[in-house]
Amino acid sequence: MKPLRMCIGCVALSICSQMFAGVESQVSVAASDEFNPHRIEFALETGYLFGAINPPTDYQIGALFLTERIRWGVVRTDGWLRGYNQFYISAIAEPIFKGIENYYFGFNVGFRYNFVQQHSRFIPYFSGGVGAGGIDSHPEVPGAQGQDFTFNILSAAGISYIVNDDWKLDVGALYQHLSNRGQTDPNPSLNLFGPQVGVTYSF
C-alpha cells in the first residue's frame, strides 16, 4: 500500500505543479498584453511664447495647436524607457500680440515619445518636428520677417496626466523657431519660448 500511496502522491504533486505553472504563465502573458496604449489621439493645445536669443524686437505670441497623434511603436520593458512613440501632425494658428507682424498660420509634423511607468498617472514626454506656414510679413520694416512664407521648428517637453481611459491633461514647455532659411537678406529669424497646456482625447 505504501508504494501505491507514494505513487498517487507523486502524480498529484505533478498535476498541481503543472496547473500552477500554467496559471503563472497566463498571468505573465496577461501582464505583457496589458500595456497597449491607444492608437489615435486628438489634442487641443495652447501656449504663450516670448521672443528670446536676440530677437529683432520684443515679441509675445499666442500659440494654438490642433494635433492628431498616431501610435507607431510600443517599447515593452520594465526599465525607464517603457513607453511608446507617436507620429503627429499639427495645424497652427498664432496671433502675434506684441511684435511687428500680426499673425502666423502653418503646420508642423514630427514625433513624440511618451515615458509610461506602471501604475502611474503621470507620463513625461518630449517631441519635435518641422513645418511651414505664412506670416503677414513687413519686409520694409527693420527687424521684420523678410517674406510671408516661413519654415518652423517646434520642440516640447512636459508631463501628461491621465484623467481616465479617454482623457489626458498636458502641461509643458515649448520652443519655436521661425525662419525663411535665408531666402531673403537679411533673414531675422524668431526664437520663442514659453509654457504650454493642452487636453487630449484618445481612442
Where are these regions (language model features)?
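Membrane-embedded beta-strands of outer-membrane beta-barrel proteins
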Residues: 66-68, 107-111, 126, 155-157, ...
